[in-house]
Amino acid sequence: MIYSTSTYNHDLGSKDSYFDSDGNRTGSGTHGYALHYSVPFGNWQIAFNRNHYRYHQAIAGYNENYDYSGNSDNTDLGLTRMLYRNSHRKIDVTAKVWKRESHNFINDAEIEVQQRHTAGWAVNLNHQEYIGNAVVNLGLGYKRGTGADNSLRAPEEEFGEGTSRMKIITVDAGLLWPFTLGNQQLSYDSSFHGQWNKTPLITQDQLSIGGRYTVRGFDGEVTLMGERGWYWNNNLNWQYKGRHQVYLGLDVGHVSGPSTEMQLGKTLAGAVIGFKGQIKAGGQWYYDIFAGKPIYKPQYFRTDRTNVGFSLNYSM
């Protein structure tokens, strides 16, 4: 699997991103764009996000892989309020309304019962704490689906296997700890994401692991999905020259819930090595080049032995 991402940061808090990934075996991949615009005012900030993507993904089954493809549009408008801030900590809360539309296909034939038009609201509480040289981030979120904007009810509701009125709780935690070893500048960063469901979930609301943004080392063509789950990312970084670093990463993830019973397994682990840094040339360029491989996967779970990718971001 080869990944690529490019991002352009404008003035006035706007950011446009374009991403692309292509699979080596099945033609699986993701292509799309993301737009972000934000405006701060006092202790408040308003933000608008929209992303569109087309994807092809193979889901692991007992006897064969299913080519699951589609397109999706996600839009949200949020308002953030700074609740507390001093030299050691920062606490803020964000409330947003969101809308999602999607169409899905199997072997290029649209799955009519999987047409989605859902909307709702979400709230997130975030806490950032400075402890010596380390920075700790904690987040708690709740997402609720409603009948707003002429939402369509999920066909799975008739069988108790999903709903457009989902209730999802998320937990996030992160750590950045810079330190020195001799005269070498090192740092350790770690992030955790967990999801719990209070209602049955359709596929689009389930947690998927195995790819660049969840458990690295996997090509993302085949994933594991579940109503509940978590993944944990870890990096050891060495600043070998100026603003340039080499890093080693280790990730693990696990999913559970009724939908996982027909999958090959529930746990993945992978490793990655990469180079990242900044270059000043008519603005700031940020690059990340990496290669990863699986460490643990279920038997018969198909993925490339090695996966490479890069991202390039520009900021004025």
List the predicted regions and their residue ranges:
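Extracellular loop and loop/strand-boundary signature of outer-membrane beta-barrel proteins
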Residues: 6-23, 61-67, 105-113, 154-162, ...
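Beta-strand segments within the central parallel beta-sheet cores of soluble alpha/beta enzyme folds
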Residues: 2, 93-95, 248
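C-terminal transmembrane beta-barrel domains of outer membrane proteins
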Residues: 157-316
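Short, electropositive alpha-helical surface patch
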Residues: 36-40, 107, 112, 302-313
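Transmembrane beta-barrel architecture of outer-membrane proteins
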Residues: 5-7, 29-33, 52-56, 71-75, ...
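Predominantly transmembrane beta-strands of Gram-negative outer membrane beta-barrel pores used
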Residues: 1-27, 31-54, 78
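Transmembrane beta-strand segments of outer-membrane beta-barrel domains in Gram-negative
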Residues: 40, 45-189, 193-195, 199
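Polar/charged side chains located within well-ordered beta-strands of beta-rich proteins
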Residues: 3-5, 31-33, 37, 50-52, ...
